[in-house]
Amino acid sequence: MNWLFKKIGLVARQSKPEVVESLLLLSHHLESQGLHVFIDRDSVTRSQAQGLTLIDRSDFGKIVDVAIVLGGDGTMLSVARLLAPYRVPLIGINQGRLGFMTDIPLHQMLDSVSAILSGEFLPEERMLLQSTVVRDGVEIAHHLAFNDIVINRGAMGQMIEFEVFVDNQFVYSQRSDGLIISTPTGSTAYSLASGGPILHPTVPAISLVPICPQSLNNRPIAINDSSEVEFMLTRGIDARVHFDGQAHCDLMELDRVLVRRYRNSLKILHPLGYSYFDMLRQKLHWGERLL
């Protein structure tokens, strides 16, 4: 078989033995096909690592042609942020819960992966967000987000007050539990639970979704993905900004969070026959067609 990708990186969630078992099965299968397999060092234990080629996850972008994630969307998020700067595509094997991004079921893993690696796939470009936290004119933090950037109240439980600007134009001031700045990928996550819209992955938009606003006039809005969003905390003693729920930065009053689309997109490779709407219908338990 002619392979389009020959150097394959594998990542799994080590805390789940059944996931690691699937990773080892896939690794042996790919190596038997003559492919070079590199496994994330943190995905297996020392006893499981015998005979495997281990590398740090942070080195994947420099070495592999494609990365395969076995687990849930949380694992996919962390790997996506690492690989986006290198434009390395991702394949997701679902061994988590919902699996909006890890769409290949376990029982189809070997056949689907082999087909994709040989060039039979549907590519899908997904945008990321880049953010900068500014305090007293100094940039104190930089992060990427694949799903969303969330600014919210902390453990004190008090509402925060903030102002939002888009391309230096004032949009609104708000008193609420926080704000979700979401990509189309993240529109089916926290944003959706907070009343935000579902955005198709190809829609060039960023959504701004209030979290429990004091005024019911504050509604979600979608803006062009070429825009820059500026969030300024005007009142809040215990506020924090989260990046994909996996990194955070504590905020002080008058801190600003600047958000824009990241320069690179991330390519996800789906099996032939994949449909975004089929996935939504399955994950969200929508009704089937009547005719």
Curated annotation (Swiss-Prot):
Which subcellular locations apply to this protein?
Cytoplasm
What reaction does this enzyme carry out catalytically? NAD(+) + ATP = ADP + NADP(+) + H(+)
The enzyme's E.C. designation: 2.7.1.23
Biological process (GO) annotations held by this record are: NAD metabolic process; NADP biosynthetic process
Q: Binding positions for NAD(+)?
A: D73, G74, N147, D148, R175, D177, Q246
- What main location does UniProt list? cytoplasm
Active site at D73 (proton acceptor)
Question: Can you name one GO molecular function term for this protein?
Answer: metal ion binding
The record's keywords, sorted A to Z, are: ATP-binding, Cytoplasm, Kinase, NAD, NADP, Nucleotide-binding, Transferase
Q: What PANTHER family does the database record attribute to this sequence?
A: NAD KINASE
Provide the family line. Belongs to the NAD kinase family.
Its function, per the record, reads: Involved in the regulation of the intracellular balance of NAD and NADP, and is a key enzyme in the biosynthesis of NADP. Catalyzes specifically the phosphorylation on 2'-hydroxyl of the adenosine moiety of NAD to yield NADP.
Indicate what this protein is called per its UniProt record. NAD kinase
Question: Species name for this entry?
Answer: Laribacter hongkongensis (strain HLHK9)
Record gene name: nadK
